């Protein structure tokens, strides 16, 4: 009995001294992709208890140091409209706001864009947008996806 416990204790000791479990150690991910996952959030807009819009946003200023030195707040945003034929935010009359301020620009990003390929979360159905806002001197950034009928999805990011 003591021999079994001793072997179990020694085995446990060697196993616990090994590498700690990390979700990304089984995948080949570069630093940008890993940070992209860390600074990406998702929310939904529900209508009649069913998902109508899926909204993802990645705060790019936290992902890449080069971006954080600019005077802009940059987000890579993905939007999927569940029950709509068109996936375009403008055709569906949606807009973005950051702390109630409109963006400087909204650019459509193609899925094969090499600059953002490692940040795109394999969303084959929705569309991606690069949304630029003027820099804000606040601690919390709240990006909103809003339509004309006051349906809103919002995500909060720390600056």
Where is each model-derived feature located?
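Bacterial signal peptide processing site
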Residues: 18-21
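Post-signal-peptide N-terminal segment of Sec-exported extracytoplasmic proteins
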Residues: 37-69
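Edge beta-strands of extracellular beta-sandwich domains
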Residues: 151-159
């Amino acid at each position: 009995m003591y021999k079994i416990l001793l072997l179990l204790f020694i085995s446990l000791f060697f196993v616990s001294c090994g590498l700690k479990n990390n979700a990304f150690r089984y995948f080949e991910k570069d630093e940008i992709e890993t940070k992209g996952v860390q600074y990406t959030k998702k929310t939904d807009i529900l209508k009649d208890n069913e998902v109508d819009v899926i909204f993802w946003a990645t705060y790019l200023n936290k992902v890449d140091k080069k971006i954080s030195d600019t005077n802009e707040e940059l987000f890579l945003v993905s939007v999927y409209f569940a029950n709509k034929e068109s996936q375009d935010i403008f055709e569906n009359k949606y807009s973005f706001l950051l702390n109630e301020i409109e963006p400087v620009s909204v650019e459509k990003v193609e899925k094969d864009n090499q600059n953002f390929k490692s940040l795109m979360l394999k969303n084959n159905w929705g569309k991606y947008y690069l949304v630029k806002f003027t820099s804000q001197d606040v601690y919390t950034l709240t990006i909103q996806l809003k339509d004309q009928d006051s349906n809103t999805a919002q995500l909060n990011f720390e600056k």
